[in-house]
From Swiss-Prot:
Record's protein name: Phosphoribosyl-ATP pyrophosphatase
E.C. no: 3.6.1.31
Localization annotation: Cytoplasm
Organism: Bordetella bronchiseptica (strain ATCC BAA-588 / NCTC 13252 / RB50)
GO molecular function, one term: ATP binding
Amino acid sequence: MTPPTAGDDILSRIADTLATRRPEAGGDPQSSYVAKLLSKAPDAFLKKIGEEATELVMAAKDGQPDRIISETADLWFHCLVALTHYNLRPEDVLAELARREGLSGLEEKARRPRD
């Protein structure tokens, strides 16, 4: 497998595919895992996000690089499903990361609105 280059837009391509799995776009829960998650949303994909985050924590705690990569991919995928459900795109998240770039973590946190 050739590693992706910096110019690859894999997150955007995955988001495009996920959008076709939305029930209102004709996604069939009988034949598509994503359509099934979206048809049971949000509980189904939120549960998966929690499971994948826990598995990532366990892999990191065990110091297993291959599992860390695999579990991160699983977590990101299910986060992309959540973005799809809420009509958001990975580009929205990337824009937020770009906005935060160069800020001190403490400074950025202090700028957030209080609930």
